[in-house]
Design a protein with these regions (language model features):
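S-adenosyl-L-methionine-dependent methyltransferase catalytic module, highlighting the catalytic core
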Residues: 14-15, 26, 30-31, 85-163
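A short beta-strand submotif of the Rossmann-like class I SAM-dependent methyltransferase core
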Residues: 74-80
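Short loop/turn segments at strand-loop or loop-helix junctions that form parts
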Residues: 56-57, 78, 107-111
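Conserved N-terminal segment of class I S-adenosyl-L-methionine
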Residues: 1-70, 74, 89-91, 123-126, ...
Length: 163
């Protein structure tokens, strides 16, 4: 088993390889159906199966703050919000693109992983706490909100909310 060390803590090497979404797909496939978006997969081959890809590396007019002017059944996003200066604004915008009953499925780096904190990783501008994400969805009147408090082997957590 390969591991990496960062600031005296040992982590599984898989956390340094990218493509975190693969660990969320088995759960997401049980929940997400219909027409959807994958926001921020970084590569086409890393996108949620069947979803329309929204990413700055895709040459089109869309990004996390400028989505197609249509409604979707779900939005999947893995390890994207921590890269955005205004994650609240992004989620507010994403919510406007969901059908009634639509689902936002987030897979996010857990704050306990030292390397993913913004002061240790220049690509991350936020460290998102599970309770903050849960509070956001609850305050925005999502009907069903599920957020894991702990982390998985990829040191990530899930947040799933339905309008």
């Amino acid at each position: 088993m390969k591991t990496i060390e960062f600031e005296g803590k040992e982590y599984l090497e898989l956390q340094s390889k990218g493509y975190a979404a693969q660990y969320a797909f088995p759960f997401a496939k049980q929940i997400l159906t219909g027409k959807g978006l994958d926001i921020g997969p970084n590569r086409k081959e890393w996108a949620f199966p069947g979803a329309r890809i929204i990413d700055i590396v895709i040459p089109d007019n869309y990004d996390a703050f400028n989505l197609p002017d249509e409604k979707f059944d779900y939005i999947f996003s893995s390890h994207c919000l921590e890269h955005l200066n205004d994650w609240v604004g992004a989620l507010n915008h994403w919510s406007t693109r969901l059908n009634n009953g639509g689902i936002i499925f987030l897979y996010l780096p857990h704050p306990d992983q030292m390397y993913w904190r913004p002061w240790n990783n220049r690509h991350h501008v936020n460290i998102l706490e599970p309770n903050h994400i849960e509070d956001y969805f609850t305050c925005k009147k999502f009907n069903k909100v599920f957020v894991t408090k702990g982390y998985d082997l990829n040191h990530s957590f899930y947040a799933i909310a339905q309008l």
